[in-house]
Structures are given as structure tokens and as C-alpha cells.
Amino acid sequence: MRAQPRTASIQASLDTVTKKWWLYLLLLLLFFVPTYASKSYDPEKSIDLIGQVLSAPLIYGLPILMPVAKLVPLALAVGVLLYGNRMRRPFNVYVAVLYLALAFLQTSAVTDTYGLVVISGNLALVLIVAVLWVWEVVAEKNDFKSVRRPKWRWWVAPLAAISLLAPVDATTMSPDFAPLRLITNEAGLTYCMMTPVVLAVLTLFHPSVNPAVLRVSSFAGMLLGAVNMIVWFGLESWGWWMGVMHIPLVLISVYAFALSHASTEAM
């Protein structure tokens, strides 16, 4: 019986902290944490260094997982919409495990030029999101019971589908609509493509979801989305299509973040 009051107390603290502006400033500052490389490198080569990590992170070392990482979240998202709280724990557990894996394995790579590289800021940011999802597995504040929702709320669905399919060649950054590639590409093992799917589900059930999880997950999505907008539409405009692929992340994250701070009485 003591566990429930303790859980409620921790959740209340998280709800309070995630309303504070300084938390988001601290999360933003994580981007300024230096990237680790086992071989010394010229700071002017930072973009190339990060690009090498993101093009071949450790998590891509198991290509057999790529189609699985698309089909499982799709099944879980549909399952939550159809069966409600009977699918809550599988959904929460999958997202928590996925984010834990992404925190350590999508932010790291072994490169010929720089050796072992870890994008420390990204690791810390995604790890914070992952820890909150681990907490949600314990607290179960996401309530996925069947509810009537306005039709306009479904605008997130097609954008989430685009992110899940991600018709892009991650090597050339060019469009790739080959049917087999849509099923087997890397999207299911990336934070930027999977977060729109996760947030889309949460926004469809808002306000009966964990507010702390929604706030931090969406803010991290906003940050990473903004960085990708700058990179692919500015610094590396040759890869503009990859920028297009990040538009769902930006739009859904901004929407989810605004929703998470909106008064529930107005819903």
C-alpha cells in the first residue's frame, strides 16, 4: 500500500518540475556538451564527425531488427487504439526499451577517422526521455481507454505514417519509395522518425496521458527537429529531402508540447 502514495508523490514532483522553464533551458544546454571521440579531432570537423555517427550508428549493426522495429510499433499503436489499456504495458515497455537503446546505440559509432565517437549531448537528452518512459512503465499514468475524440485530432496520423515509412535513402539523402525499403529501412531505429509515432498516440489520448512524459518527449523532439532543420535546409542543403523527413517531428512535437502545457479544463 505504501508504493501507491510514493508513486503518486514522485509523479506529482515530475509534473511540477516539467512545468518549470529552467528545466528546458538545462535540456537545451545539453547540446553544448562536447562530443567524445577516441581520436583527437579538429573542432571544425564536428559536423563531419557527427554525420559519420548518424549515418552508421552502432544500432544499425543488426539490420535484421529494422523491419521488426517498424512492424512492432505499428502493431502496438494500432493495438492501443483498438484495445486501450490492455495494450498499455506492452506499448510503454516497448517505447522505454527503444529509447534506452537509441540513447546509447544511435548516438555512438566506431569510425575509421575518429575511432569510437559518442554524441554526448544527444545521449544525455534521449536518456532523460528514456528514463521518464521507464518511470511510466512503473506509474502507468497513460490511460488509453476508448474515448471519443474530435476528427481534427487525427491530423497527426498521416504525418506519423510518413515518419514510420521514411521514404529516404540514408546514404544519399535522396527520396526512396521502393516498397521493400519502406519496410526495411532504418527509420524504426531512429529517435527522429519514431518519436512522431509515439507522440501521435499520446496526443490522441490527451489529456489522459502522463504529462511529464509528454512534455519532455515532445521538447526533445522539438530540439532535435530544429537542429535537423538547420542542418538539412541550411548547412547541408544538398540533403534537403532528409529535412523534409523531419518536418513531421517538428510539427507533432510542437503540437504535443503545446498540448502538454494547455489547461485540461480547456480540452
Question: What annotation goes with each model-predicted range?
Answer:
Residues S38-K39, F104-Y114, A166-P179, V227-W238:
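Juxtamembrane "helix-exit" motif on the non-cytosolic side of transmembrane helices
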